[in-house]
Amino acid sequence: MSNLYVQMQNGWTAKNIESLRPYFTDALFTQMERSLQGYAQRGETNVVERIAVLDVTPLGFHQTGGEDQILPRLRTRITDYTVNDGTQQIVRGSRDQEKFMTYEWDLLRPTGMQTNAESGETKRITCPGCGAPLDVNASARCPYCGTVIQQQAQDWVISAIRGIKQQTL
């Protein structure tokens, strides 16, 4: 989860989270993409730097409605600011002030699925639109033809990220 958090923040700054699609539900991925599109429409970039995951604590495991659910809490440290793409001037936040964030994530997978360490986190399939090979967990966008492929999640996906606490130093 620590690695995924860092990848997510780096993708956010790069305004490209497509490589993270297999790790999110379609609803959460779409919500995050819309947020990034809002920054792009305003001509802004939300920059996240000095990323560190300080702690990951499992809070619980549940089975409901045919799904397994894991609830971890992540404590992180970042710097977070927004720049105008044209002028590179900071419009919100600070390059210097560190934010200590606490999040709770919801991770889901179908009950009965088992994580196979040898096969990794995704499944290799063929794009129905153009025949290209794709690695998919819950969904993926073909980089060749743009087709979005959805299937039942084969492994854990993040369905929600809740900000619990924020402290700026």
What are these regions (language model features)?
Residues 7, 47, 82, 117-120:
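Amphipathic, alpha-helical segments enriched in basic
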Residues 1-51, 129, 143-148:
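Core segments of small alpha/beta cavity-forming domains
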Residues 1-12, 23-24, 72-76, 101-107, ...:
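Long, contiguous hydrophobic alpha-helical segments, chiefly transmembrane helices and signal peptides
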Residues 69-71, 85-169:
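Short beta-strand edge/turn micro-motifs at domain boundaries
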Residues 11, 45, 59, 92-94, ...:
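Short, well-ordered helical secondary-structure segments
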Residues 22, 34-41, 68-74, 93-94, ...:
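Generic detector of short, locally flexible boundary/turn motifs and exposed helical patches
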Residues 41-86:
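Surface-exposed, charged secondary-structure patches
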